[in-house]
């Protein structure tokens, strides 16, 4: 059994010597089983200013509306299937149920149009049950939407749209009705899961905890998980974890990576990226094609016809680029300076990095997203 008073005293002593590059344990790891749960529901938004679903094209909206009316004892006459409800929209409602959320607490919800509603601005979400993956209702949502975008259309068909008016949020729009069972207070141990698996970081966490509490209190399961002995008393367990999660850990250096987004031209080069000795030159070839048609005018009394004769001019120009050389163990700063000296655009830099990787000179993972 852990000596909890000894733990408090040791933690107080360790808190006076924190590393400069250290990070809190709570920022790099989470407790197994302590997580949020996703909820989803289907409902109706009413009160729209003529921007709701076109019910002839979205029959499920009218069906949902009729089902709601029947719950209030209102029967819709037969043959009214072509009724237009321009101020009603069918929506999906989603929310994250935080860990340890209790009945009566409020959570934020996101409301998104399912049909062809133009805008949910000014709408009110009617009572909507939110279910978990197990089919149970964990929260009830209702309230007025906050929509950041808007949509406007003129009589001539001109239209302007700002942001996304077909989705919105309701802060505190759902009331928790059922708590999710948690295994936090069960057993004599807890498992810490690293946000990024790293054997060096896992070992440093184990060493830090064992130095403070004694050998064998923390054990590494693998590069991403650590098992820690914990008090059986729930109140002591909370105090115990409040100390552990504030421990300062010096995490291991991340794997060297170069991330390339080919769609946006964004390139991110990690700090640990290095280049082996290599020489690089990257030319820029520009091909210009211009059309300069001429008019052929026949001579008088020749019975000829005036005609347009195409005339194309093709010009190819290649810009000379100086060669730059990477020495052994070239760092990120040196890579950036060398690339800037030749004036390489993002597209050129992508080609250079890919060529370096193929040549075996780029000591990093090249990831294209």
UniProtKB/Swiss-Prot annotation:
GO CC terms, sorted: bacterial-type flagellum basal body, distal rod, P ring; outer membrane-bounded periplasmic space
Claim: Signal is one of the keywords in the record: yes
An example Gene Ontology biological process: bacterial-type flagellum-dependent cell motility
Signal peptide: 1-22
MF (Gene Ontology): structural molecule activity
InterPro entries: Flag_FlgI (IPR001782)
Cell location: Periplasm; Bacterial flagellum basal body
Record keywords, A-Z: Bacterial flagellum, Periplasm, Signal
Top-rank lineage group of the source organism: Bacteria
Alphabetical list of PANTHER family matching this protein: FLAGELLAR P-RING PERIPLASMIC PROTEIN FLGI, FLAGELLAR P-RING PROTEIN
Family as reported in the entry's similarity comment: Belongs to the FlgI family.
Entry-linked NCBIfam families: PRK05303.1
Role played: Assembles around the rod to form the L-ring and probably protects the motor/basal body from shearing forces during rotation.
Quaternary assembly: The basal body constitutes a major portion of the flagellar organelle and consists of four rings (L,P,S, and M) mounted on a central rod.
Protein name: Flagellar P-ring protein
